[in-house]
Amino acid sequence: ESLLSAFDLTAREAEVLYWVVQGKINLDIADILGASPATVKKHLERIHGKLGVETRTAAAAMAVNRVRALQRSG
C-alpha cells in the first residue's frame, strides 16, 4: 500500500513492482498475475516513467529504499 501512495502507482503496478523486487522475470510475473508478458512489460514501462528510472533494477532499488524509509519513519 505504501508503494501506491509513494509513487502514485496503480494497484496492479504495485503488484508488478513487488514481484520485480522479489527477483521475478516478466514471464513469471505474468504467470503469477494471470496476465500476458506484454501486459507486464507495459506495466513496467509505466512504473519506470512514474519512478523516473530506466531499468527494473533501479525501480526495485528505489522501491526497497522507499519502503525502508517509510518503516523507519512510522
What annotation goes with each model-predicted range?
Residues 1-42, 50, 64-74:
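Helix-turn-helix DNA-binding segment
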